[in-house]
Amino acid sequence: MKTLILKKLALISLLSLACASWVHAAERIAFIPKLVGVGFFTSGGQGAVAAGKALGVNVTYDGPTEPSVAGQVQLINNFVNQGYNAIVVSAVSPDGLCPALKRAMQRGVKILTWDSDTSPECRSIYINQGTPNQLGGMLVDMAANQVQKKQAKVAFFYSSPTVTDQNQWVKEAKDKIAAEHPGWEIVTTQFGYNDATKSLQTAEGILKAWSDLDAIIAPDANALPAAAQAAENLKRQNVAIVGFSTPNVMRPYVERGTVKQFGLWDVVNQGKISIHVANELLKKGDLNVGDKLDIPDIGMVEVVPNRVQGYRYEAKGNGIVVLPERVIFTKDNINQYDF
């Protein structure tokens, strides 16, 4: 009898250990940037990892060394095969990741996007820094604050012709220019492909090709500092350089007066919000339009319909969480931020 009891206790212990291991595996979240080695994505990853520690969730930050569909797909497949229960990805393409993401969802993995979305049917929730209307309008307004002429020449310069988020913002920005600044001529739209060296070469090429350029609008973490550096290299103080990047990268250009205004959002908080939302999905199964989540030190966020991003697709368990605020950085406030 004593031997039988001991065997039963041993079996219960083994089952308890197995259950504990399973629970731990179910709380692993992968947080994937477009590529590693860029301050913007590193800051988002730091926020994600910090949120994971606060929640008791194991968060892994990893991405490709170059922004490619193949690189992200390989990581997604690896995380799925390793038993991760949620993946949050900044997509380099709206459709290129979809087959891999749909396979992951079929295996029970929660799929979210952050920073740059996929087609909405390929994920559950998109953690969105701002709607295209908000961010496209922000870009034009920053340029208009400096370009006072009715007739002006403007260039757009960002990462690539296929990346989801930036192309949505640029479309809205160009529409706003056509409606509100009909005398502005968009002389070129060029790309740096997330490469610092190529971005600097491209920015210098733009400035050399248009000696009378009034503004460069660069909504990309590599393109904006490259445009600022190009303006300094070529001594083009009369060009308004605006766009999106991190304050730590842009601080020297703001302090020297090369850049008067640029914008962003708190990407550290974007990483934190992403993990809180992913964790909530792991606990509840779904989040639907109208559901709210109170995140410590950030506040209340709400799931809103996909249509705020211009999509037609709506479904149960599918929507967008928009960050509560965006920031315009100037010499007066930039030292209040460290990311």
From Swiss-Prot:
Disulphide bonds in the chain: none
This protein's GO CC annotations: ATP-binding cassette (ABC) transporter complex; outer membrane-bounded periplasmic space
SUPFAM superfamilies: Periplasmic binding protein-like I (SSF53822)
Keywords: Periplasm, Signal
Transcription among keywords: no
GO MF assignments: carbohydrate binding
Major localization class: periplasm
Pfam families: Peripla_BP_4
Organism superkingdom: Bacteria
Signal peptide: 1-25
Compartment(s): Periplasm
Family: Belongs to the bacterial solute-binding protein 2 family.
Quaternary assembly: The complex is composed of two ATP-binding proteins (LsrA), two transmembrane proteins (LsrC and LsrD) and a solute-binding protein (LsrB).
Function: Part of the ABC transporter complex LsrABCD involved in autoinducer 2 (AI-2) import. Binds AI-2 and delivers it to the LsrC and LsrD permeases.
Stated name of the protein: Autoinducer 2-binding protein LsrB
Organism (species): Photorhabdus laumondii subsp. laumondii (strain DSM 15139 / CIP 105565 / TT01)
Biological classification of the source: Bacteria, Pseudomonadati, Pseudomonadota, Gammaproteobacteria, Enterobacterales
